[in-house]
Amino acid sequence: MDQQPIQVIGGGLAGTEAAWQIAQAGVPVILHEMRPKRFSPAHHTEHLAELVCSNSFGAMASDRAAGLLHEELRQLGSVVIAKADEHAVPAGGALAVDRGQFGQDLTQTLASHPLVEFRRGEVPYIPEGIVVLATGPLTSPDLAADLHRFTGMEYMSFFDAASPIIVGDSINRDIAFMASRYDKGEAAYLNCPMNKEQYLRFREELCKAEQTELKDFERETAKFFEACLPIEELAQRGEDTMRYGPVKPVGLSDSRTGERPYAVVQLRQEDKAGQLWNMVGFQTNLRWGEQKRVFQMIPGLEKAEFVRLGVMHRNTFINAPQLMLPTLQFKQRPTLLAAGQLIGTEGYTAAAAGGWLAGTNAARLALGKEPLALPPTTMLGALLEFISSASPKHFQPMPPNFGILPDLGMKIKSKPERYGRYRDRSLADLSSWKVNLT
C-alpha cells in the first residue's frame, strides 16, 4: 500500500526544514505555500524560506545562544543551516546570508527531491492525517480562523506585546526586594523601588527615547490593544500615569526599610528555575538600544542582561504551554504538529530548529515510531521544554538564550567560561542522544 504523504503547511524556514527532514526519512511530503498566488503583507518573492527582516541568523560563536543552536542543527543535518553556511556573507561575528541565493537554493533543493511535492496556493483549513503547521506570524486569515476554532479562542494571539526578559543573576538583589502586593500569598515578585527623583528622571528619558515604527498592517491590529499600551505611551500621557499603572507602589513596602517607594517596577518569574524575570507591564516600541539605555536606569537593573527585549508587532501564535508537547505535537491531536513562530519560538534559527523536530517526529509517526524530545540540556531541547511548560497565563514568545538551560550545578562568575560549559554539555548530550534517531 502506498504511504500517505505528510502535509506541511507553510514554506518558511520551519516548513522548509520540516519538509526536508520528512523526505530524507523516506516519507512522501506535500509542501503547501500560498505564494505567489497570495502574498502576506511582508513577503515579496515566491521562494521558500524568504527572510523578510534581517538577513542574519545571529552570532556564529558556539558559546553564544544562537551560535550553539547553529552547531546543534549542523550535527542534526539541518538543510537550512547547511544552506546558510553555503551562502554566508561577511557580517563580523554573525551568520548572515545572501538572502536571494539562499532562498533560491533552498527552493531548488526541495523541488529536486523525489519525495517532495510542491503545491502553490492557500490552505484554508487544517487537513486530516499527519500535518505540520508552519504558517508563521502572518498566517492567512482563513487558516488562522480554523486554527482559532481548533485551539479555542483564549489560546491564540494575533499581536505580540511583550515585555523585556532579564537574566536573574544580573539583577542587583541589594536593591530589588521580593514581595507580593499587600503581602498576599508568598513573595512572588522582584520589586525595583524608585524615589521621586529617580522616577521623574526615568520618565523623562522614557518620553525622549526613540521608537520603532509599526508597519501599516501592524498598526491596524495594534489599535485594538488599549490594555497593552507601550510603557512609553503611558509615560507621555501624564506624570503619574505609570504610577497608577505598571509601576504603582500601593501595597508594596521594602521590609528592609519599612518604607513605601514612590514607584515600583515589578519583575515576574518567567521559568521554573527562576533564572529569567519579566518586566511586568513594560511592553514597548522603543528601539533596542534605547530599551537597554533607559531600562538600566531603573534601580537594581543597572547591569541587567536582557535575553529578550520588548516588542510590539503582528504575530499569530498559540499558547504552546496549554496546547503542545515538547515533541511539538498538539496534546488534543497527536498527528498535528507545529513549528516556528506560530508556537512561540522567536528568530530564524529557532524556526528552523523547530521545523527539524516537527519534521522528524512527523516522519516517525508515519513510520510507526515513537516521537522524540531532545535533552533539555541542549539549546533546542531547552527552548521546546520552555514553550511547552511555561506559565500559560503569561506566555510570550521566547528566543534561544542561556537562561533557559538547566543550571550547571556550580557557580561560574566568568560569563565566557560559563557559556562555554553550557556549550560543551549541550553538544556532548546531543551527540549521545543522536543514537535515538535510528
UniProtKB/Swiss-Prot annotation:
Keywords assigned: Cytoplasm, FAD, Flavoprotein, Methyltransferase, NAD, NADP, Transferase, tRNA processing
Transmembrane residue ranges: none
One example GO MF annotation: tRNA (uracil(54)-C5)-methyltransferase activity, 5,10-methylenetetrahydrofolate-dependent
Cofactor needs: FAD
Enzyme Commission code: 2.1.1.74
Binding-site residues, FAD: G10, G11, G12, L13, A14, G15
Subcellular compartments: Cytoplasm
Alphabetical list of InterPro entries matching this protein: FAD/NAD-bd_sf, MnmG-rel, MnmG-rel_CS, MnmG_N, TrmFO
Top-level taxon of the source organism: Bacteria
PROSITE patterns linked to this entry: GIDA_2
Main location: cytoplasm
Entries under HAMAP family matching the protein: TrmFO
Described function: Catalyzes the folate-dependent formation of 5-methyl-uridine at position 54 (M-5-U54) in all tRNAs.
Annotated family: Belongs to the MnmG family. TrmFO subfamily.
The protein's name in its UniProt record: Methylenetetrahydrofolate--tRNA-(uracil-5-)-methyltransferase TrmFO
Organism per entry: Nostoc sp. (strain PCC 7120 / SAG 25.82 / UTEX 2576)
Taxonomic classification: Bacteria, Bacillati, Cyanobacteriota, Cyanophyceae, Nostocales
